[in-house]
Amino acid sequence: MLEVSNLTAIRDERVLFENLQFEIKPGELVQIEGRNGTGKTTLLRIVTGLGDRDEGSIKWKGEAIEKSRDQFHQDLLFLGHQTGVKRELTAFENLRFYQSIHNSDSSSERIFHALTQVGLAGREDVPVAQLSAGQQRRVALARLWLSHQILWILDEPLTAIDKQGVKVLESLFSNHVDNGGIVILTTHQDMFADSPKLRKIKLGD
């Protein structure tokens, strides 16, 4: 379980959010929503341990993330605005590298399946530097199909993704939470419309 208590973030003397408090349990799909500038990305970066908070605490499985950093990072998959893919490697090589550092199943079949799911079949051996920005984003998203991590934190994962791609990701997110995972995301897309699966946390007015 992820526990956020009394979280406050101030940037350039402006309070983005104050005394924010929530718990997210396994099996939950949560969307952080709010207008631009309300601190959605800041919140995700703080929760992952990449950003600084002014007050408050964050616990994962009952322990402060500062004290259980290794375990927390083993359980976490974070996709931010930067794709994190290596431009000099191909799409396939990027996913092989990802698998190697996370000690996950390194079968070529799983990699090809992941790339097919994000619409990159036939582009496996193209250097990422030659792919469009949207395709580079898809290489990063393909990691989700290879992930064994419980906690997925995704900042605008649907950027440059078409309607069919959104449906594929909706299905993936549903399966992940149905199997006891947690998904926390920001998006401007209308996902899971009227679905009881989706819980929303709103920042700002």
From Swiss-Prot:
Q: Which GO terms describe its molecular function?
A: ABC-type heme transporter activity; ATP binding; ATP hydrolysis activity
Record-linked SMART domains: AAA (SM00382)
Q: How does it assemble?
A: The complex is composed of two ATP-binding proteins (CcmA) and two transmembrane proteins (CcmB).
Q: Which cellular components does GO assign to this protein?
A: plasma membrane
Protein name (Swiss-Prot/TrEMBL) = Cytochrome c biogenesis ATP-binding export protein CcmA
The membrane topology term of the UniProt record is: Peripheral membrane protein
Matches recorded under PANTHER family = ABC TRANSPORTER I FAMILY MEMBER 1
Reaction(s) catalyzed by this protein?
A: heme b(in) + ATP + H2O = heme b(out) + ADP + phosphate + H(+)
- List the subcellular locations: Cell inner membrane
Per UniProt, where does ATP bind? G34, R35, N36, G37, T38, G39, K40, T41
**KW NAD (keyword) present:** no
Tell me which residues make up the ABC transporter domain: 2-204
> Keyword set for this entry?
ATP-binding, Cell inner membrane, Cell membrane, Cytochrome c-type biogenesis, Membrane, Nucleotide-binding, Translocase, Transport
Q: Which family does it belong to?
A: Belongs to the ABC transporter superfamily. CcmA exporter (TC 3.A.1.107) family.
Q: Give one Pfam hit by family name.
A: ABC_tran
What are the recorded Gene Ontology BP terms? cytochrome complex assembly
| Stated role | Part of the ABC transporter complex CcmAB involved in the biogenesis of c-type cytochromes; once thought to export heme, this seems not to be the case, but its exact role is uncertain. Responsible for energy coupling to the transport system.
Provide the gene name from the record: ccmA
Q: What is its EC number?
A: 7.6.2.5
